[in-house]
Structure formats: C-alpha cells, structure tokens
C-alpha cells in the first residue's frame, strides 16, 4: 500500500512538473540512441534499459545511489526530494527507474506504449531524455 501511494505521489509530481532540468534539443538521433530495435519509437523496456545504463554511468563511486551532485542537470534538488520516498537524500536504482517509468508515461499522452519523435520533442519527452541519456 505504501509503495502504491508513493508511486501515485511520484507520478503526480512528475506529470505536474514534466521538466526536471533545462529542456534539451530533441531530434530523431535521440530516438536512435535509445531504440535498439530501430523501429523509430522508444518503448518502456527500452527507456528502462537506457535509464539503468544512465544510472550506472552517473554512479562513479558505485555506492548504488545518486545524490544531488551526481544528478546535477538531470534532476533538481527540489525534484530529488519529490522522487525520494525514503527521504535519504539519494535515489537508488529502483527509485531512479520509477522516475524513468513515470516520466515515460508523462511523455506518452496517447498511452500507446511507445514514444515517437513528436512525443520525445515535448517538454515531458525532453525530461525523459534527461533521465536516460
């Protein structure tokens, strides 16, 4: 129950404020970078795989968490607090991937399970790119 509530709060926070950081310029190249099956769209599985790889890249001390310094440019300190259900000041991989999933859903307003170039160019899509690049 607590996980569902925290997931609902997380999703609400993400949908209410779709951009964590300054939007990036998004092009078809961005899709190709996260689209290993080359179908021209990003599905949730691909977004989570890219998010997992991004998390690993962002965690140079390999402590399994990302703090505000490691998240700089991807998640503001204010948004870190919203995304941190255990309030320890860091995001572990599970918390980070929950943010990726929620942002994927925010960037997919037609709920077709994939993000195309138009959706990726939206503010919510740009915020997703910030998390998975």
Curated annotation (Swiss-Prot):
Query: How would you summarize the temperature dependence of activity?
Result: REE-LanM complexes are stable over a broad temperature range (up to 95 degrees Celsius).
Residues noted as binding Nd(3+) 3 in the record, renumbered to the chain: 84, 86, 88, 90, 95
Residue stretches making up the EF-hand domain: 35-46, 59-70, 84-95, 108-119
With respect to pH, the record says: REE-LanM complexes are remarkably resilient under acidic conditions, retaining REE binding down to pH 2.5.
Binding-site residues for Nd(3+) 4, renumbered to this chain: 108, 110, 112, 114, 119
Q: How does it assemble?
A: Monomer.
What is the recorded name of this protein? Lanmodulin
